[in-house]
Amino acid sequence: MMTTARPIILHHFEKSPFSEKVRVVFGLKNIEWTSVLISRIMPRPDLMPLTGGGYRRTPVMQIGADIYCDTQCIIRELERRFPEPTLFPNGYQGIGWSTAMWTDRSFFQNTVNLVFGSLAGQVPQDFIADREKLRGAKFDVPAMTAAIPQMRDQFRAHLQWVEIQLGDGRAWMSGDTASLCDVNAYMNVWYVRAHLPNADEVLAEFGNTRAWENRMRSVGHGRSSEISTSAALDIAASATPQTAILADTNDPNGRKPGDRVEVTLTPMSPEQREAHLAEYRKGFTINPCH
Protein backbone atom coordinates (compact mmCIF):
# COMPACT_ATOMS: atom_id res chain seq x y z
CA MET A 1 0.00 0.00 0.00
CA MET A 2 1.28 3.42 -0.93
CA THR A 3 1.18 6.03 1.80
CA THR A 4 1.45 9.80 1.89
CA ALA A 5 3.48 11.93 4.31
CA ARG A 6 0.84 14.65 4.12
CA PRO A 7 -2.59 14.06 5.63
CA ILE A 8 -5.45 13.31 3.28
CA ILE A 9 -8.02 15.98 4.06
CA LEU A 10 -11.63 15.75 2.90
CA HIS A 11 -13.72 18.92 2.91
CA HIS A 12 -17.30 17.62 3.08
CA PHE A 13 -20.61 17.65 4.90
CA GLU A 14 -22.27 14.63 6.44
CA LYS A 15 -25.28 14.29 4.13
CA SER A 16 -23.39 14.97 0.89
CA PRO A 17 -23.98 11.97 -1.43
CA PHE A 18 -20.78 12.45 -3.42
CA SER A 19 -18.82 12.80 -0.18
CA GLU A 20 -20.28 9.46 0.86
CA LYS A 21 -18.77 7.89 -2.25
CA VAL A 22 -15.32 9.04 -1.19
CA ARG A 23 -15.88 8.08 2.45
CA VAL A 24 -16.82 4.55 1.35
CA VAL A 25 -13.63 4.37 -0.73
CA PHE A 26 -11.73 5.31 2.45
CA GLY A 27 -13.49 2.39 4.12
CA LEU A 28 -12.79 -0.12 1.36
CA LYS A 29 -9.11 0.81 1.37
CA ASN A 30 -8.88 1.34 5.16
CA ILE A 31 -7.38 4.78 4.60
CA GLU A 32 -6.54 7.14 7.44
CA TRP A 33 -7.88 10.61 6.65
CA THR A 34 -8.71 13.98 8.14
CA SER A 35 -12.22 15.41 8.11
CA VAL A 36 -13.03 19.08 7.60
CA LEU A 37 -16.75 19.74 7.90
CA ILE A 38 -18.05 22.55 5.71
CA SER A 39 -21.38 24.24 5.13
CA ARG A 40 -23.63 22.52 2.63
CA ILE A 41 -24.21 25.86 0.90
CA MET A 42 -22.03 28.80 -0.13
CA PRO A 43 -20.16 30.78 1.05
CA ARG A 44 -17.32 28.64 2.35
CA PRO A 45 -14.72 31.29 3.19
CA ASP A 46 -11.91 28.96 4.30
CA LEU A 47 -12.36 26.55 1.39
CA MET A 48 -12.77 29.12 -1.39
CA PRO A 49 -9.08 30.18 -1.36
CA LEU A 50 -8.14 26.55 -2.09
CA THR A 51 -10.52 26.10 -5.02
CA GLY A 52 -10.29 29.46 -6.73
CA GLY A 53 -13.37 30.97 -5.13
CA GLY A 54 -16.29 29.78 -7.24
CA TYR A 55 -16.30 25.99 -6.97
CA ARG A 56 -19.63 24.92 -5.45
CA ARG A 57 -19.50 21.16 -5.44
CA THR A 58 -18.71 18.82 -2.58
CA PRO A 59 -16.40 17.13 -1.67
CA VAL A 60 -12.93 18.58 -2.16
CA MET A 61 -9.83 16.56 -1.27
CA GLN A 62 -6.64 18.25 -0.11
CA ILE A 63 -3.19 16.72 0.22
CA GLY A 64 -0.80 19.46 1.28
CA ALA A 65 -1.21 22.20 -1.34
CA ASP A 66 -2.64 19.84 -3.97
CA ILE A 67 -6.41 20.26 -4.30
CA TYR A 68 -8.61 17.66 -5.99
CA CYS A 69 -12.09 18.65 -7.18
CA ASP A 70 -14.64 16.25 -8.71
CA THR A 71 -15.38 12.86 -7.20
CA GLN A 72 -13.94 10.84 -10.07
CA CYS A 73 -10.70 12.84 -9.88
CA ILE A 74 -10.53 12.23 -6.13
CA ILE A 75 -11.20 8.51 -6.42
CA ARG A 76 -8.67 8.16 -9.24
CA GLU A 77 -5.99 9.75 -7.06
CA LEU A 78 -6.87 7.52 -4.10
CA GLU A 79 -6.61 4.44 -6.32
CA ARG A 80 -3.20 5.66 -7.54
CA ARG A 81 -1.88 6.26 -4.04
CA PHE A 82 -3.49 3.21 -2.44
CA PRO A 83 -3.71 0.55 -5.18
CA GLU A 84 -4.51 -2.29 -2.78
CA PRO A 85 -7.20 -3.34 -2.29
CA THR A 86 -8.13 -2.18 -5.75
CA LEU A 87 -11.48 -0.72 -6.73
CA PHE A 88 -11.25 -2.83 -9.90
CA PRO A 89 -10.92 -6.43 -8.65
CA ASN A 90 -11.66 -7.92 -12.06
CA GLY A 91 -9.55 -5.42 -13.94
CA TYR A 92 -12.55 -3.79 -15.60
CA GLN A 93 -11.66 -0.16 -15.04
CA GLY A 94 -13.73 1.06 -17.97
CA ILE A 95 -16.88 -0.48 -16.54
CA GLY A 96 -16.12 0.88 -13.09
CA TRP A 97 -15.67 4.45 -14.29
CA SER A 98 -18.49 4.37 -16.81
CA THR A 99 -21.13 3.24 -14.30
CA ALA A 100 -20.86 6.75 -12.85
CA MET A 101 -22.47 8.08 -16.03
CA TRP A 102 -25.58 6.19 -14.90
CA THR A 103 -25.40 6.51 -11.13
CA ASP A 104 -24.27 10.15 -10.97
CA ARG A 105 -26.57 11.48 -13.68
CA SER A 106 -29.91 9.87 -14.53
CA PHE A 107 -30.11 7.75 -11.36
CA PHE A 108 -28.99 10.58 -9.11
CA GLN A 109 -31.22 13.20 -10.73
CA ASN A 110 -34.17 10.89 -10.18
CA THR A 111 -33.08 10.34 -6.57
CA VAL A 112 -32.78 14.09 -5.94
CA ASN A 113 -36.25 14.74 -7.32
CA LEU A 114 -37.73 11.95 -5.22
CA VAL A 115 -36.02 13.08 -2.02
CA PHE A 116 -36.74 16.80 -2.25
CA GLY A 117 -40.21 16.27 -3.66
CA SER A 118 -40.97 14.09 -0.65
CA LEU A 119 -39.49 16.60 1.82
CA ALA A 120 -41.48 19.46 0.25
CA GLY A 121 -41.91 22.29 2.77
CA GLN A 122 -38.96 21.08 4.87
CA VAL A 123 -36.40 22.28 2.29
CA PRO A 124 -34.83 25.58 3.50
CA GLN A 125 -35.05 28.58 1.21
CA ASP A 126 -31.31 29.28 1.43
CA PHE A 127 -30.62 25.74 0.22
CA ILE A 128 -33.02 26.20 -2.70
CA ALA A 129 -31.33 29.48 -3.66
CA ASP A 130 -27.88 27.87 -3.51
CA ARG A 131 -28.90 24.93 -5.69
CA GLU A 132 -30.46 27.27 -8.24
CA LYS A 133 -27.09 28.98 -8.61
CA LEU A 134 -25.40 25.60 -8.96
CA ARG A 135 -27.85 24.39 -11.60
CA GLY A 136 -28.48 27.65 -13.40
CA ALA A 137 -32.17 26.74 -13.29
CA LYS A 138 -35.10 26.79 -10.92
CA PHE A 139 -34.93 24.24 -8.08
CA ASP A 140 -38.66 23.63 -8.25
CA VAL A 141 -39.64 21.68 -5.14
CA PRO A 142 -43.43 21.90 -5.79
CA ALA A 143 -42.88 20.43 -9.26
CA MET A 144 -40.77 17.65 -7.72
CA THR A 145 -43.58 16.95 -5.25
CA ALA A 146 -46.14 16.76 -8.04
CA ALA A 147 -43.87 14.31 -9.89
CA ILE A 148 -43.42 11.89 -6.96
CA PRO A 149 -45.46 9.07 -8.60
CA GLN A 150 -43.27 9.26 -11.71
CA MET A 151 -40.10 9.56 -9.61
CA ARG A 152 -41.08 6.47 -7.61
CA ASP A 153 -41.56 4.56 -10.85
CA GLN A 154 -38.17 5.65 -12.17
CA PHE A 155 -36.34 5.04 -8.90
CA ARG A 156 -37.88 1.57 -8.80
CA ALA A 157 -36.60 0.92 -12.32
CA HIS A 158 -33.06 1.98 -11.38
CA LEU A 159 -33.14 -0.22 -8.28
CA GLN A 160 -34.36 -3.13 -10.36
CA TRP A 161 -31.09 -3.01 -12.31
CA VAL A 162 -29.17 -3.31 -9.04
CA GLU A 163 -31.48 -6.10 -7.89
CA ILE A 164 -30.98 -8.05 -11.11
CA GLN A 165 -27.20 -7.67 -10.94
CA LEU A 166 -27.24 -9.17 -7.44
CA GLY A 167 -29.83 -11.77 -8.35
CA ASP A 168 -27.45 -14.72 -8.75
CA GLY A 169 -26.47 -14.55 -5.08
CA ARG A 170 -23.25 -12.57 -5.52
CA ALA A 171 -22.25 -10.35 -2.62
CA TRP A 172 -21.13 -7.40 -4.74
CA MET A 173 -22.02 -5.87 -8.09
CA SER A 174 -18.93 -7.28 -9.82
CA GLY A 175 -18.72 -10.60 -7.99
CA ASP A 176 -17.01 -11.66 -4.77
CA THR A 177 -15.21 -8.37 -4.05
CA ALA A 178 -16.53 -4.83 -3.69
CA SER A 179 -15.65 -2.48 -6.53
CA LEU A 180 -16.21 1.04 -7.78
CA CYS A 181 -19.48 -0.19 -9.30
CA ASP A 182 -20.76 -0.79 -5.77
CA VAL A 183 -19.57 2.61 -4.56
CA ASN A 184 -21.30 4.34 -7.46
CA ALA A 185 -24.66 2.61 -7.10
CA TYR A 186 -24.71 2.72 -3.30
CA MET A 187 -24.67 6.53 -3.24
CA ASN A 188 -28.31 6.74 -4.35
CA VAL A 189 -29.58 4.12 -1.93
CA TRP A 190 -27.64 5.83 0.87
CA TYR A 191 -29.11 9.23 -0.07
CA VAL A 192 -32.68 7.95 0.14
CA ARG A 193 -31.92 6.20 3.43
CA ALA A 194 -30.32 9.36 4.85
CA HIS A 195 -33.24 11.64 4.00
CA LEU A 196 -36.55 9.81 3.68
CA PRO A 197 -38.46 8.56 6.74
CA ASN A 198 -40.22 6.03 4.49
CA ALA A 199 -36.98 4.61 3.05
CA ASP A 200 -37.86 1.12 4.33
CA GLU A 201 -41.07 1.21 2.34
CA VAL A 202 -39.32 2.54 -0.79
CA LEU A 203 -36.74 -0.27 -0.66
CA ALA A 204 -39.00 -3.03 0.70
CA GLU A 205 -39.38 -5.15 -2.45
CA PHE A 206 -35.65 -5.23 -3.22
CA GLY A 207 -34.32 -7.95 -0.93
CA ASN A 208 -30.99 -8.43 -2.69
CA THR A 209 -30.40 -4.69 -2.72
CA ARG A 210 -31.21 -4.28 0.98
CA ALA A 211 -28.80 -7.08 1.94
CA TRP A 212 -26.13 -5.48 -0.27
CA GLU A 213 -26.88 -2.08 1.30
CA ASN A 214 -26.13 -3.57 4.72
CA ARG A 215 -22.84 -4.95 3.45
CA MET A 216 -21.94 -1.56 2.00
CA ARG A 217 -22.77 0.16 5.28
CA SER A 218 -20.56 -2.27 7.18
CA VAL A 219 -17.57 -1.20 5.05
CA GLY A 220 -17.40 1.98 7.12
CA HIS A 221 -15.38 5.10 6.37
CA GLY A 222 -11.82 4.15 7.25
CA ARG A 223 -10.00 5.90 10.12
CA SER A 224 -10.64 9.60 10.51
CA SER A 225 -9.84 12.54 12.75
CA GLU A 226 -11.17 16.09 12.50
CA ILE A 227 -9.56 19.51 12.08
CA SER A 228 -10.95 22.99 11.44
CA THR A 229 -11.22 24.69 8.06
CA SER A 230 -8.65 27.28 9.12
CA ALA A 231 -6.18 24.54 10.10
CA ALA A 232 -6.57 22.95 6.67
CA LEU A 233 -5.91 26.32 5.05
CA ASP A 234 -2.74 26.69 7.13
CA ILE A 235 -1.57 23.25 5.94
CA ALA A 236 -2.02 24.30 2.32
CA ALA A 237 -0.25 27.62 2.88
CA SER A 238 2.80 25.91 4.37
CA ALA A 239 3.11 23.32 1.57
CA THR A 240 3.99 23.39 -2.12
CA PRO A 241 2.08 21.53 -4.86
CA GLN A 242 3.51 18.10 -5.69
CA THR A 243 1.44 17.29 -8.79
CA ALA A 244 3.74 16.40 -11.68
CA ILE A 245 3.48 18.56 -14.80
CA LEU A 246 2.50 16.23 -17.62
CA ALA A 247 0.89 16.69 -21.02
CA ASP A 248 -1.39 14.66 -23.28
CA THR A 249 0.50 14.62 -26.57
CA ASN A 250 -2.56 13.18 -28.34
CA ASP A 251 -4.94 16.00 -27.38
CA PRO A 252 -6.70 16.89 -30.66
CA ASN A 253 -7.18 20.48 -29.46
CA GLY A 254 -3.51 20.99 -28.70
CA ARG A 255 -3.94 21.99 -25.05
CA LYS A 256 -0.81 21.96 -22.95
CA PRO A 257 0.28 22.84 -19.40
CA GLY A 258 0.27 26.59 -18.83
CA ASP A 259 -2.64 27.33 -21.18
CA ARG A 260 -5.45 29.52 -19.90
CA VAL A 261 -8.76 27.65 -19.97
CA GLU A 262 -12.35 28.14 -18.87
CA VAL A 263 -13.79 25.33 -16.78
CA THR A 264 -17.53 24.61 -16.65
CA LEU A 265 -19.07 22.19 -14.17
CA THR A 266 -21.18 19.82 -16.22
CA PRO A 267 -23.86 18.69 -16.64
CA MET A 268 -25.85 21.10 -14.47
CA SER A 269 -23.93 24.27 -13.77
CA PRO A 270 -23.51 27.18 -16.21
CA GLU A 271 -20.79 28.79 -14.10
CA GLN A 272 -17.31 29.10 -15.58
CA ARG A 273 -13.96 29.70 -13.92
CA GLU A 274 -10.83 30.89 -15.67
CA ALA A 275 -7.72 28.87 -14.81
CA HIS A 276 -4.29 27.75 -15.92
CA LEU A 277 -4.05 24.20 -17.20
CA ALA A 278 -1.43 22.64 -14.92
CA GLU A 279 -1.68 19.04 -16.09
CA TYR A 280 -3.42 17.36 -18.98
CA ARG A 281 -3.34 13.58 -19.01
CA LYS A 282 -6.58 11.67 -19.67
CA GLY A 283 -8.27 14.23 -17.46
CA PHE A 284 -6.70 17.42 -16.21
CA THR A 285 -5.62 19.44 -13.23
CA ILE A 286 -6.12 23.20 -13.12
CA ASN A 287 -4.65 26.08 -11.18
CA PRO A 288 -7.18 28.91 -10.68
CA CYS A 289 -6.33 32.38 -11.97
CA HIS A 290 -6.54 34.90 -9.14
What are these regions (language model features)?
Residues 1-131, 270-290:
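GST-like domain detector, emphasizing the conserved glutathione-binding G-site
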